[in-house]
Every structure is written in C-alpha cells, then in structure tokens.
Amino acid sequence: MRGISRRMVLLVLGVPAVGVVAAGLAYFAWNREPAFYRAALETEAATLAHGSNELLEQASALVTDIRRQGEWRSLFTANQINGWLACDLPKNHASLLPPGLEQPRVALEKGRILVACRRAVGPMATVMAIEVEPYLLQPNELAVRICSARAGWIPLPLEPILQQIAHATTEAELPLRWDQAGGDPVAVITLEPRRDDQRVLSVESLEIQAGELYVAGTTRTGDWPSADPGPDSAPKPPVLEARLPEDDGPAAR
C-alpha cells in the first residue's frame, strides 16, 4: 500500500510538472525567431527607406533594359529587398500579403532564400519561416525547391504553401508541373516568353549568393520557336539532384 501511495503521489505531482515543462518548451519553440529576422527588424528606418528607393530605381532600370534588344542583367541585395518589403509593400501593395501575415523579411544565402513573417494565431503570434532554393533548369524554366516551413522551431506542413504556388501560377497563367529533389517538392514554372512589338524575353541566369540575387537574360527580336517543337527537338531538363539543404541550425531557419 505504501508503495502504491508513493507511486500515486509521484504521478499526481509529476504529470502536471511534465505538462508545464512541455507547455513551456512548446511556447519557446513556437515563439522562436530566426536570427536573420530579428536582425532585419532592427534595421533603422532610414536604411530601409534608402534600400527601398534603390530597389525601385534598379527595377525601373531593369524594365527599360529588358525592352531593348540585347543582353540585360541586374543585381539586387537583401537590404534592398527588405527595404522594399518594409516601406513600399505595406504602403502601395498591401493586397499582395495574405491576411494575417505582416512584416515579411528575407535573407539571401548561397543557393537559397529564407523568408519569414509574423502571423497572429488567435491571441498569440508566431514567426513563420520558409526556406526555398530557386534555380533555372534551362532558360525560362524556373525550379523552386521548397525545403522547409516552420512556425518558430515547429515544422509546418507544406501543403498550404504548395496550394498557394499553384494558385499564383494559375492566376498568372504560367504553366506549372511538380517534381521532387531529396524528398522535397519542387515547383517547375515555365516563364512564357513575352512578346512586345516582336521582342522576346529570355531569362537565362539566376544566381543567389550571400546577401545578393543576380538575374540576367536576353531580349531578342523575331519569331520565337514553337512552344511544342516535339520530343526530339525539345531540350531535356536535367535530372534534379537529391541534395539536402545545408543545415545552419534552428536559428538560421
């Protein structure tokens, strides 16, 4: 009886204690912010405004270059993108953000993009973070590998993100197919050549380095090859490598 009573006391005291610890760990994991996101939110307003203006100027110059025949290229920095996200997006393009999401920021690392934003869930708020690896399979064929999605440190299902990608490509009338790499879903999006006064746009290079995103291509005149030249003449997309993303630890995600 004494042993049973002691066991019951331990259970009565231990179960609530374990529950409190588990709840505390869950709360800590739910509210954990990626290091890059905390740093981005601490950027001074003047720096953000300057970055936003730089991005808008470079984007305008890129559009002008694309409209001319010949090669074009541009380089955008994470500071410029975050400046635009902080200043111009909420002011002039707030409808682009899904309801409940705010303060988006990005980090550019070699070969990958980290995106994070705040999301209110009832009385609580968390930081959602997504890691993607975008690259070109061939000119005008963009692959986006969705590596992970988290709320704090807690992994989230990828299905809602895949549905958002499918919806966005449908709205933009861009062909989409799905592939896999290392168990991760890969969205393969065909960027249809734009025809404007006989000019055709070809996106030929996309590189992501630490803090920088580089894009380049060519604008040509004349006819573009048929969209379906046949299985023999169509270029074959390379086989996707089953490569796992580099692991920088939970704080980097």
Range-by-range predicted roles:
Residues 2-253:
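Extracellular/lumenal and peripheral-membrane lipid-interaction modules
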